[in-house]
């Protein structure tokens, strides 16, 4: 049968005799409920929209290849990095964060940077952003951030007041806010931005020696950004500009590439680090912990069906392979639960069987998961009729002790420790970042901040000016001027203690 001569069937293979005219009682009569095809189509249509992601709802994705270019086996025995030249299939998804599925691509927002590597030891998901830091360092605040940047419960509109009230109520957010208000808060598209694992992770080698690492992905297309005015003009013509750019580039054979690097910190260095090395609001300075090249990934194949491969792509930081591991980063620890849990709600417990999520490097035929049943369990025969318990006399579900990780270093008593008593150095790094900007770039930070804070209350504006001033007096004065506020009217020595306690 020719491709253009496919004949319509129902979902269970029955031929459809008429796809335009319903079955009725007479030519002008009411619809008959025995019109099985109509019932099937409408009931499926009523259920075809799945829950969108709570964050990162609007996204674009592509398949590609990761290639090792430098030997890092002294740090890790992960097979993906076992030899120079080794290639691994992968999938990448880029996204905005705050907007819904129908939001414009060009918003002043963080961009998600999620990678899935199909290794022979299972899928490795690295769920990052285009910024190296985040707004806070304890995952208990994540629900509040989500609500603050989404729609107001009364007006159902995005609220700069809610957004900035939250951001300025959490002083450690200034580092991320500074990046967001800078040129890099509005990437031209997904191809022209860097990516970061953001969190601190760890690696271990054959000797069981552990090091702490941060992942960096540097675009080989160069960094390009838009101003607010440029972005607004483009959004008026094309709300999918970033998605279109990525898709068209790959279709035209202009495959985007990113180089992968790591920063490495030993356990001894971590003990003596001046700040908490697992604090997601801070970076490790490259002068102290230089970038080490690892490899390069290239995106070279567009999905054949967006829903199948991009909308149903499920990432979770718990998807990690031998040789790689986690860290005490409190935000990472929270995400270890929330991501997988969200995917099970959104896609079901068997979402690992969806093609884009399948562990292709292992092969379904080589897997032996203990989980059974659940909606849409079909791919592996539900493990057949063998034992569904352990131990059993068939020897099924044997552990693989050769993959046991080295001991994870922890200490201390279980307690709700006040993070602000441990570290209140919120402003040093954003101050250094501000001073690295050119004069023109600083002016754009001031302008972008004023644009973003339009309609925000005076007390919240004062709070932000105070934080900026503590990072660098020039920063605070510039923001105050852009907001048309006399800096002499701002309490520059105040604190956020009372505000924070209200969260």
From Swiss-Prot:
Keyword list, A-Z: Heme, Hydrogen peroxide, Iron, Metal-binding, Oxidoreductase, Peroxidase
Gene3D superfamilies assigned to the protein according to its UniProt record, in alphabetical order: Catalase core domain
A cellular component annotation (GO) from this entry: cytoplasm
Domain of life: Bacteria
Catalytic center residues: 56, 129
An annotated GO BP: response to hydrogen peroxide
InterPro entries, sorted: Catalase, Catalase_3, Catalase_AS, Catalase_clade1/3, Catalase_core, Catalase_haem_BS, Catalase_immune_responsive, Catalase_sf
Coiled-coil zones: none
Region (Disordered): 1-26
Cofactor requirement: heme
Pfam families: Catalase, Catalase-rel
Reaction equation(s) it catalyzes: 2 H2O2 = O2 + 2 H2O
GO molecular function: catalase activity; heme binding; metal ion binding
Entries under SUPFAM superfamilies matching the protein: Heme-dependent catalase-like (SSF56634)
Assembly description: Homodimer.
Job of this protein: Decomposes hydrogen peroxide into water and oxygen; serves to protect cells from the toxic effects of hydrogen peroxide.
Family: Belongs to the catalase family.
UniProt protein name: Catalase
């Amino acid at each position: 049968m020719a491709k253009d001569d496919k004949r319509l069937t129902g979902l269970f293979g029955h031929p459809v005799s008429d796809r335009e005219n319903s079955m009725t009682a007479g030519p002008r009569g009411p619809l008959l409920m025995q019109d099985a095809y109509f019932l099937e189509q409408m009931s499926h249509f009523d259920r075809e929209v799945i829950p969108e992601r709570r964050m990162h709802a609007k996204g674009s994705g592509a398949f590609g290849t990761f290639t090792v270019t430098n030997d890092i086996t002294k740090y890790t025995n992960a097979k993906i990095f076992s030899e120079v030249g080794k290639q691994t299939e992968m999938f990448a998804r880029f996204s905005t964060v705050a907007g819904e599925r129908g939001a414009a691509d060009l918003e002043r927002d963080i961009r998600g940077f999620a990678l899935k590597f199909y290794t022979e030891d299972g899928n490795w998901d690295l769920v990052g952003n285009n910024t190296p830091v985040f707004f806070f360092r304890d995952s208990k605040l994540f629900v509040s951030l989500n609500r603050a940047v989404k729609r107001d419960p009364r007006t159902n509109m995005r609220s700069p007041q809610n957004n900035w009230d939250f951001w300025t109520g959490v002083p450690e957010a200034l580092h991320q806010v500074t990046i967001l208000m800078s040129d890099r808060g509005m990437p031209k598209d997904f191809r022209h931005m860097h990516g970061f694992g953001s969190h601190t992770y760890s690696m271990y080698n054959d000797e069981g020696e552990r090091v702490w690492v941060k992942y960096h992905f540097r675009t080989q297309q160069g960094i390009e950004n838009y101003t607010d005015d440029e972005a607004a003009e483009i959004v008026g013509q094309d709300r999918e500009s970033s998605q279109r750019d990525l898709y068209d580039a790959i279709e035209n054979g202009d495959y985007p590439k990113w180089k992968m690097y790591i920063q490495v910190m030993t356990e001894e260095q971590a003990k003596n680090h001046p700040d908490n090395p697992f604090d997601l609001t801070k970076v490790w300075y490259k002068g102290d912990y230089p970038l080490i090249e690892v490899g390069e990934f290239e995106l070279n194949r567009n999905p054949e069906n967006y829903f199948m491969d991009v909308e149903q792509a499920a990432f979770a930081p718990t998807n990690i392979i031998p040789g790689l591991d986690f860290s005490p980063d409190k935000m990472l620890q929270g995400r270890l639960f929330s991501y997988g849990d969200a995917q099970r709600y959104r896609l079901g417990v068997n979402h690992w069987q969806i093609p884009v999520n399948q562990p292709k490097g292992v092969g379904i035929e080589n897997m032996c998961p203990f989980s059974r049943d659940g909606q849409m369990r079909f791919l592996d025969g539900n493990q057949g009729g063998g034992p569904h318990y352990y131990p059993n006399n068939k020897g099924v579900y044997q552990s693989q002790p050769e993959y046991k990780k080295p001991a994870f270093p922890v200490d201390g008593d279980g307690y709700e420790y006040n993070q602000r008593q441990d570290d209140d150095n919120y402003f040093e790094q954003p101050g250094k970042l501000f001073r690295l900007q050119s004069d023109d770039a600083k002016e754009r930070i001031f302008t972008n901040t004023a644009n973003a804070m339009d309609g925000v209350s005076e007390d919240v504006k004062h709070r932000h000016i105070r934080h900026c001033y503590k990072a660098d007096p020039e920063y605070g004065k510039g923001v105050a001027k852009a907001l048309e506020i006399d800096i002499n009217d701002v309490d520059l020595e105040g604190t956020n203690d009372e505000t924070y306690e209200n969260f």
